[in-house]
Structure formats: structure tokens, C-alpha cells
Amino acid sequence: MNGSMRHIYLFSDATGETVERVLRAALSQFRDVEARIHRMSKIRTREDILSALEDVLKEPGIVIYTLVDAELAQLLRDEAEAHGLDALDLISSLLFKLSDFFGVAPQNEPGLLYELNTEYHKRIEAVDFTVKHDDGQDPRGLSKADFVLVGVSRSSKTPLSMYLAHKGYKVANVPLVKGIDPPAELFKVDQNKIVGLLIDPHRLLEIRSVRLKNLGQMSRGSYADYEKIEDELNYCRQLYRRNPQWLVIDVTKRSVEESAAEIIQKLCS
């Protein structure tokens, strides 16, 4: 086998990207082999199968397929066998087991796997964006965010941002500090996607005090001083009033999930 090129044909009713990644992961376990991968995408009719097999027969190899339509899968198996080709079904056994486990039949809709894969990558991109734009990082990217959260330190900006990111939204957050102007970019983006966060001062004092304790800091300073916290929150309220397009949410008695749900409902409807 070493030194000779082998051909592997991937038949998919969608793009074939997912099955190719699975194949490449498997091939990584084989050293000193040469394989050329041919992706046959959007195989959804009898004609598609017969046409693709004509190409396969020019340089025969193994056929690996993920066709959720049972009739098309059977046709491919029969045609492959008739031409002396090895054919491996990557999805039927999985669908059968899941159908038995859940007690329901699969939808057999081509492309669903690709749609799920696309959604997964959307979430990955959203998380990556959100991490890179946490706590005021790179304000130049605010225009690319789906939502921009603003608020004082420890007002749930980061956990709320990450929760939304895992739902596929690109989120940036900007800390509001009295005496320091927010970045100019904040006022240049679509003002309807900005969310101002508020929190009860007593609750914020409690959160910040615990934070300092966990960091081993005995001195509270202005960070955990009630009057200073009131000043910070008053500054936020004044800023929010000057920007009436911003959505304002009080996170005091809300879970991250509840706050995220309101943002999505009010800004995406």
C-alpha cells in the first residue's frame, strides 16, 4: 500500500465538509500512506449518484457516504457493489441507533448536519469575538458587534456577554468609569444595539467586597465604598438618560439567562 496513491470518494447530500473532517481525523492515524480525497457534494437524486459514480470509475477507490435518504443510500450501495467498489455508510447505523433510543423516526432531511455544523461555527466565532472585545478591548470592533453592553465594574457585563456569545451573538462590553470618557467609537455605532446595565448599590457592594476578599485584599478603598458606588451608578444613569436609544436593564434580581432573554427579545424582534 505504501507508495501508491489511493482514492477516497466522499458522497454527501450537503457540502461534505463534516464527513471530510471525520475522514482526515481517521487518516491521521495512518503514516506513510497517500490518499486523494474527492468530495461529491449535494448528492440528492438518482442522477446525481450515477453521474458521480462515472467519475469514481475513472480512478476507482473506496466510497464513503452520508446520505440520509434511505433509497438513495441503497442505490449507491447497489451500484458500488455492481462495479466492485467498497462502500462505507457513516450515518445509517447512527440514525438507526438514535431512532431506537428516542423512539422516533429521523427526519431524513438532507443538509441538516451542515446546518448544525454552520450554527456551531457561528457560536465559535461569536465566542472568539466576545473574548477579544471584553472589558473595553479593541473599541474599533464595536461596529461589528451584535450587542454592546456597558456598565460599571462587576455589573455582570462579562458573564452576560459570554452567555449571549454561546447563543451565537457577537458581543462587546465597555466599562463605565466616572471621570473617564467612554471610547468615541461607542457613540458612532448603531445606538439601538447598546445595552446599559444597572444594579442595586447594596448588591454591587456585596459583590465587590467578596471579589476583594477572594483576591486577598483587606483594604476596600473606593472600589467597595458605598458612596463611591452610588456616584458610579448615578454617572451611569445620567449617561443612559442622555442616550435614550439605549436599552437599560437592571440586573439586580435577574439571572444572566433572564437578562439575555430580554436583550434578545427587545433588540432582535
Swiss-Prot record:
InterPro entries noted in UniProt: Kinase-pyrophosphorylase (IPR005177), PPDK_reg (IPR026565)
Reactions catalysed, as given in the entry: N(tele)-phospho-L-histidyl/L-threonyl-[pyruvate, phosphate dikinase] + ADP = N(tele)-phospho-L-histidyl/O-phospho-L-threonyl-[pyruvate, phosphate dikinase] + AMP + H(+); N(tele)-phospho-L-histidyl/O-phospho-L-threonyl-[pyruvate, phosphate dikinase] + phosphate + H(+) = N(tele)-phospho-L-histidyl/L-threonyl-[pyruvate, phosphate dikinase] + diphosphate
GO MF term list: ADP binding; ATP binding; phosphotransferase activity, phosphate group as acceptor; protein serine/threonine kinase activity
Keyword Protein transport belongs to the record: no
The UniProt record lists the keyword Kinase: yes
Binding site for ADP: 151-158
Top-level division of the source organism's lineage: Bacteria
The EC number(s) this enzyme carries: 2.7.11.32, 2.7.4.27
Keywords: Kinase, Nucleotide-binding, Serine/threonine-protein kinase, Transferase
Entry function: Bifunctional serine/threonine kinase and phosphorylase involved in the regulation of the pyruvate, phosphate dikinase (PPDK) by catalyzing its phosphorylation/dephosphorylation.
Annotated family: Belongs to the pyruvate, phosphate/water dikinase regulatory protein family. PDRP subfamily.
Protein's name according to its UniProt entry: Putative pyruvate, phosphate dikinase regulatory protein
